[in-house]
Amino acid sequence: MPPEPARRPLKKAVESAEKMLARLTEQMDGVLARLADPAIYSRPGTVVTELQKEKARLEREVANAEKRWLSAQEALEAAA
């Protein structure tokens, strides 16, 4: 097993990816809650369209963050 200082950057990468996933998930929950509100669909304008675009953006970011987390986790496990 490599010494702890050698693993520290790998642990930080995993923790950073986990924090990013948590932040993105929280944002996604907010967007989904707004899209679940029936009242939003009776309003004129582009609110729904903008929320759908935001949802799609967040879905892409979550997928990328999950890949970064998995890669970091695998590197940490390989260093064990």
Predicted regions and their residues:
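Charged, heptad-repeat coiled-coil alpha-helices that serve as long linker/dimerization "arms"
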Residues: 1-80
